[in-house]
Amino acid sequence: PSSGGAVLVTGIGEGTGTSSSGYGVLVQSGTSITSGGTGTLTVQGTGSNLATNLNRGITVTGGSIGSAGGDVTLIGQGGGAGTSQNGQGVRVDSAGVVSAGGNGNLNITGVGSSATGSNNAGVSLTNTNSRISTNNGTIHLVGSTLGTSQPGVDLSVNGVVQSGANNTVTVTTDSYSGDGTASISAGTGIVNIRNRTAGTLINLGGADVLGGSPLTLGLADAELERITAGTLEVGRNDATAAGAITVSAAISPTLASNLTVLGGGDIAIGADVTVANTLVLAIGADVTVANTLV
């Protein structure tokens, strides 16, 4: 660990022939990368491009990456080729922890492999006690893949994303997978699940569309019900505005008091939307309502 200065760690996975596990940066159980004081911490990793498995950019498996009080930034590029698997950009599992202490903010950017095998998400968090968290700072996850078969952000098996002191959690991706056990929490603050690419369609209650153009960011009700926030924001209406938004199946984000839907195109509400307090539609075109807004 540093005593307060900035820390930069960079790793590039290598290998020859059929060797696998070409991690860019690997932090295993019992090991850590840390910065002290208010020093910033940046970790960059690129996985091997061999057509083998486990060529992740950054892997935190049982170990930890964190600061005492500075900002933390992880940037991972998954490797692999052909049908290889586990080429995630950034992977946190097996009770691994990535955290920012004090007033530090946490930013994680992961790009998954172009390979067609499984588990090639941009940012992946899985397993009980695996956590991405801050003490009193924001969290921003940015996930994408070079392929067309895996989500940009994949949260599963009790993985937790949690900001401290009700700070904002932002997830920027064109495809999202969250199972019925993983969770995101900003306390009474804001969680924003938004598209990465301008014009990406959003389907509330539906599934991702991972190929073609435009892509579709699908957010099923079961995924939305694992998000705790004062306000859940979906989409964006800035220079990278979402395209048309559809509510294709009933949604009721029960752990979020308010729901704001942001976009640059039309919104077609074809199923029930149930919100505890306030629903805001901040979009750039027409609103069509065929079902109940509660």
Feature annotation, model-predicted:
Residues 1-294:
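Extracellular lectin-like interaction modules
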